[in-house]
Swiss-Prot record:
Annotated ATP binding sites: 37-44
Main location: membrane
Subcellular compartments: Cell membrane
GO molecular function, one term: ATP binding
Enzyme class, broadest EC rank: translocase
A Gene Ontology term for the protein's cellular component: plasma membrane
Family matches, as Gene3D superfamilies: P-loop containing nucleotide triphosphate hydrolases
EC number(s) recorded for this UniProt protein: 7.2.2.11
SS bonds (residue pairs): none
Family per record: Belongs to the ABC transporter superfamily.
Organism: Staphylococcus aureus (strain bovine RF122 / ET3-1)
Domain ABC transporter: 4-245
Function: Part of the ABC transporter complex NikABCDE (Opp2) involved in nickel import. Probably responsible for energy coupling to the transport system.
The name this protein goes by in its record: Nickel import system ATP-binding protein NikD
């Protein structure tokens, strides 16, 4: 069953050039779904379109958009407690003049009616998931942490809300190999054991083949191939997909992607 089903998604710029060209996309419930492709293909644009985060100079249209079996016009009301978003711009998620403990507590209590103690308990649990300890984080400011630490705090801030769907745009790109694999193991555990759904945009093809159940391949704004992991491991593939999987490298990113 698909958690998100969007038909004929098109994204255009002010010159009416189509950046995303009428794609059909399903995100399957309780699975790790992946979107892969070269830089500039439009992967991050799709994630932002799903969340209504597109830049003002881009327009988005679609024929139909369903979330959990219901037609929706806006997903913003689901953001946070139902849909979590892990973006590439984690450094912009926290201010520099408030301690992280206070910021995380405010985020949690914005979405759930809870005491400060209950919020801190959820925060502590989420930080432990990303291999951090509350005593090392909560009394610090964001600028006192390394980039890798801050990204893990950001991931924890999404996970602590226990969203039904997590949309993750390069969630481990700034982490070292060990912490990156640990975070991917954690995300896999959340999907398998707690029934959550993950839609991941990544350049790491090794992670895709190891963790994902369903894969979408994007090229120049069009989805050229879709299928479950067995299709990508054992069946004849589009030449472009074969090339991506053959190299299994992290592809270069650009401004939009």
């Amino acid at each position: 069953m698909s958690l998100i089903d969007i038909q004929n998604l098109t994204i255009k710029n002010t010159s009416e050039k189509s950046l995303i060209k009428g794609i059909d996309l399903k995100i399957f419930s309780q699975q790790i779904n992946a979107l892969i492709g070269e830089s500039g293909a439009g992967k991050s644009l799709i994630a932002k379109a799903l969340l209504e985060y597109l830049p003002f100079d881009l327009t988005c249209t679609y024929y139909s958009y369903q979330f959990d079996g219901e037609n929706v016009s806006r997903l913003s009301k689901y953001y946070g407690h139902t849909i979590g978003y892990i973006s590439q711009n984690y450094a912009e998620s926290f201010n520099d003049h408030t301690k992280l403990g206070k910021q995380l507590t405010a985020i949690y209590r914005k979405h759930y009616k809870s005491s400060k103690e209950e919020a801190l308990s959820k925060i502590d649990k989420a930080l432990s998931w990303v291999n951090l300890q509350s005593k090392d984080i909560l009394n610090k400011y964001s600028f006192q942490l390394s980039g890798g630490q801050l990204e893990r705090v950001y991931i924890a801030s999404v996970l602590m809300l226990e969203p039904k769907l997590i949309i993750a745009d390069e969630p481990v790109a700034s982490l070292d190999a060990l912490n990156g694999n640990q975070v991917m193991d954690l995300l896999q555990h959340i999907v398998l054991e707690h029934g959550q759904t993950l839609f991941i945009i990544t350049h790491n093809l090794s992670h895709v083949l190891k963790y994902c159940q369903y894969i979408n391949v994007l090229k120049e704004g069009q989805i050229i191939e879709q299928g479950n992991i067995d299709h990508f491991k054992y069946e004849h593939l589009h030449p472009y997909t074969e090339q991506l999987i053959k190299y299994r490298t992290q592809l270069k990113r650009d401004y939009y992607d």
